């Protein structure tokens, strides 16, 4: 079992921390690849995105807030990421005794066209469909993303 530590800065951004955010999101990319490579050997890898009082957060928040963010309030969630029947490829957000799952998802999207029909204006005309979050898909591997692109292509050429 492997657990990497990502960060809300990597998942969502934070002013002045581009290098840190890039490194922390890079761990999510590594996790997504290793979950595929390790599956045949029952190697499971997950990520925790903790909100906890650390040396990095000292002085940024009042003591009464930091008291609610003890690192041990993240630990029970991490324990679930390493148990025998643990998931793999999960991003667990954890802090102050609260837990949620974060995911990278993609909207249904739209086929816009090819050749002369494919213009910035055509993409703009389809923007509402491209950015519609009412239908979202979580891909388990990069190949699934490619399959989705070709499904949009096929549907677009039919209609």
State where each predicted segment sits.
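Residue(s) in the substrate-gating loop at a strand-loop-helix junction
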Residues: 7
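Active-site helix of classical SDR
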Residues: 23
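Conserved cofactor-binding/catalytic machinery of classical short-chain dehydrogenase/reductase
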Residues: 18, 26-29, 73
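Conserved Rossmann-fold SDR core element
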Residues: 28, 35-48, 86-94
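C-terminal helical subdomain
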Residues: 65-157
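Conserved catalytic-site region of short-chain dehydrogenase/reductase
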Residues: 10-12, 54
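Active-site loop immediately N-terminal to the catalytic Tyr-X3-Lys motif
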Residues: 12-19
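Short, flexible catalytic-loop segment of classical short-chain dehydrogenase/reductase
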Residues: 41, 49-59
